[in-house]
């Protein structure tokens, strides 16, 4: 699963996920993409589950790019532990997603196959997404 190799600080404050994606909002590598319409967090497990669904559907053809990386640690206290005594240990990593961010890209397959693969992947994700194609000349 995806997670940072090392971080300067183990824990991070919660923060607020606001605004629209300005970077990573265009299809850059492949011909087709899966773009976020809603906002939220994607865990490393969700990113991997969607990747597996796409890879299984396109079989040997095509290439997939993952355009997001879970770099934010989410901490949690153990069950039945009283409040206080500091922040819990990092449990898993998430990627903060803003509307407009391209999550995955695909190349080397026809549009119908790409649409179906992205539909299967979108079913694994907790945010609304849409299918996009690369602009001509970019």
From Swiss-Prot:
GO terms for cellular component: cytosolic large ribosomal subunit. Keywords: Ribonucleoprotein, Ribosomal protein, RNA-binding, rRNA-binding, tRNA-binding. PROSITE patterns: RIBOSOMAL_L16_1. It holds the Pfam family Ribosomal_L16. InterPro entries: Ribosomal_uL16, Ribosomal_uL16_bact-type, Ribosomal_uL16_CS, Ribosomal_uL16_dom, Ribosomal_uL16_sf. Residues 1-13 have a biased composition (Basic residues). The keyword Amino-acid biosynthesis does not apply. It comes from the Bacteria. GO terms for molecular function: rRNA binding; structural constituent of ribosome; tRNA binding. One of its GO terms (biological process) is translation. Residues 1-22 are annotated as: Disordered. SUPFAM superfamilies: Ribosomal protein L16p/L10e (SSF54686). The keyword RNA-binding applies. Belongs to the universal ribosomal protein uL16 family. Part of the 50S ribosomal subunit. Binds 23S rRNA and is also seen to make contacts with the A and possibly P site tRNAs. This is Large ribosomal subunit protein uL16. It comes from Thiobacillus denitrificans (strain ATCC 25259 / T1). The lineage of its organism: Bacteria, Pseudomonadati, Pseudomonadota, Betaproteobacteria, Nitrosomonadales. The gene is rplP.
